[in-house]
Amino acid sequence: MTTFCRVLLIFGIYVAVCCAQSVEDDVFHFTNPSQGNAVWILDESSLPWTGGYQFLRSISGMPTTLLSVVDSSTGVTLGQCVAPQDATGNFSKRWERFSWELTASGLDCTFEHGAAIRVEFDRTQNPRTFSIRIQSITGPACLRDVVVQTEQATGCPPHLSRNSFTANALNCSCPFLDAANEDSEIENEDVDMLANTPQFPLFKGIDPSVLGSANPPTLPPSPCANHECHNNGTCLVSQEGAATCLCRNGFTGDRCELDVCSSVPCQNGGVCRSNNGIAYCECPPAFTGLLCESAHTDESVAPICRPECSNGQCVFKDGQAQCECRQGFTGANCNVLDVCLGDAACSMFGPLAKCVLDDNMDKMSSLTLINGTYDCLCPHPIHGQFVDCMQLHAPSATSVQPTEQVVINNVTPSFPVLEISKLPTGAPVTFTATSTTLMVTQPTVTVSPTHQVPSEPFVGFTVTRAPLRPLDIGSTTLPPPFNQHIITAGEPTWSSQQPHQPSEVPTQTTFIFPQTPETTTFAPTTGTQQPVHKFVSPSVPDENEEEEEEETTEETEETFPTPSTMQVATNGQFTTETAFVTSTIPSTTTDMEETDEDEDMTEEVTDSSTQPSTTVFVQPTTTFTTEAPTTTMEEEEEMTTDQVEDIESEEIATTTTQTSLPFWMTTTNKQVVPDSPTPMVIMPHPQPDEKMETSTEGVVDEESDEERTTVPESNEEVVTKNAEATTPSDITHHHTSSGKQSSAAASWIIAIIALIVLGLLLLATSLFILRYIRQSRKLHGKYNPAREEHNLSAAYAMPMSHIAKEERLI
């Protein structure tokens, strides 16, 4: 019995809570008394539109406005359903029934006890869109049983699936539910459901006497109570709480007190109209003009429109010639596209947004077809009126945080901006003094003496980098066809050079790509000047040159003949040396190894020292063995003979030297000024039988002998005053390429060992798994304890066949 009572108790509690919840979910009220509303937006295609609900009158004592219909395009209130006063002076607290029916011509309001009101709308030729509103300012205190087009609102907050609406501050429950005096017994039971709930220790209900004695909350007076709007204007409360007047068409002012047509005297029966605060006269068909002061001429004459109609026809309209535009066009001469056709221009703001052309588009005249300007209007979520969508979706001005002003300073680029410049065609001239600068893979590279070992093939050189500095460019003369490929950096030119003491020694560099012999001369300059760098674009080698190179290729080496020139000053005079540089590359060298060597050279170039002075050291007694290409010896001899004849007239010795360079070549102009604090260069005149040798990264390249051309008139050696020109013998050469090969071999060995160890581990794991499987099968598959016991007993038992029949019977 006790268990049955407990079950009944729990069931009663559940029923009471469910009933209370259903009552609360079926009753609604506006939590914001000043801005709460529910808005539907309709067009004429949705009419007739019906609905209804039960309501409690407004607690303010003013007439309760149950429904308002506003023209969305103009904001004019077309009609309202106001609850009639009762005997209690609108203070009756009981549920009342209200229903409505909206048509294109008017609004029908029906109240209980048969009371009905009909509100007629002003006729218009233009299609209308309606904004139907239930507002909390003077609206009902609570609502329930809301039905629209036979669909009842459900949920909390309420919603309709087929007749959706936008609501603001509309929530479930009603704080005045206990004070409502219902007439019917069913309504009394619904209202007193919470009051008559059984009282249990854990669920104590609310005492009805407490709710009945509580004073209803008082609302502050509306700002529109003391704000009167004239000429049938509508008072609205803004978001800031200020009262504003929404004026009818034709009136303006803070309180709609100004009539825009009062100062426009239309003549000859014309009627003053206004559009957005602008008054104009609507003239009868027989008159025209600003004030309808002019009579029309004979309309039988074909109308002539000025300017001519582009996308329409000229017709008489209201007594004057006007352009009647086709669909999709507007303007005075129908040359303005109606971009609002179909409202696709404002579709990004939602389905309720509409596109409206500017007012002056119908009067705009254009000789060419242009797009019309428009505005996107969206219904305001509070009062439902159409406002600018950009202002509606833009953030409030008060929510914008101040940001710091970004100051952009002029930033000097860290790279040279190159441009193609025209080269002068004047005669080449020599310069006073120069130093040697080489360009490898960085924008600018300088050559300076150091005890660090450079990368192959720059033996005895240290390549350094320095900050970029603007420099001036001198004139340059190059033989065709390479002069059109010179890229100069304009003024100023950005170059990389360490700061050094002022001197009259400008530095000049020419960068020549493979197979491009080049000679560059510069005009003499004085004063402090930084090195200027020239870049020569690579030229495509001829097929004949490639064939000649293939003919001179042997089994063990490959030669690339690349002539270059060098100028050296001797006792204040200039000596020009013409060197035919031949680079030998072993036949076993691959492209990948060449790339590795280039990368090693680039890395050492980056890490080298940055001394400002630049000097090339040449060993006087060194020997160099190489093999000159047989196909180019005659050309070399002719070139050398021509240069010797020119040099003999100037008493300058010409010597042919050779050095080891990479597949590109460098034309270097070197001059040494006597009494200069920088180290000088000694360029001896080697004898025909002498040999020169150079070391590149500790590897000596052995090459075949080559004939050397010397001038018999000059047998003296060049002696400098301030420095010895011998190559430093304490330079330590590094085997960069061999080091990389050894590291690669070590990597392969480690990888092979790792693979072997991994294979052994896999083999051991496989053996372990196989052994486990065999043991598992033996234990779980073939092994049977009963069978084993039987076999064991049979083995030790005496066979019955050896026992006599009599003994077996016993």
Curated annotation (Swiss-Prot):
Highly expressed in the pharynx, circumpharyngeal cells, pharyngeal-intestinal valve and a subset of neurons in larval and embryonic stages. Also moderately expressed in the lining of the intestine, coelomocytes, labial process bundles and some hypodermal cells. In adults, it is predominantly expressed in the pharynx, the pharyngeal-intenstinal valve, some circumpharyngeal cells, m3, m4 and m6 pharyngeal muscles, and IL1, OLQ, BAG and ALN neurons. Gene3D superfamilies: Laminin (2.10.25.10). SMART domains: EGF, EGF_CA, FOLN. Disruption phenotype: Worms display a reduction in pharyngeal pumping rates, body length and intestine size, as well as a prolonged egg laying period and smaller brood size. Keywords: Disulfide bond, EGF-like domain, Glycoprotein, Membrane, Repeat, Signal, Transmembrane, Transmembrane helix. The chain crosses the membrane at residues 749-769. It is a single-pass type I membrane protein. This is Abnormal pharyngeal pumping eat-20. It comes from Caenorhabditis elegans.
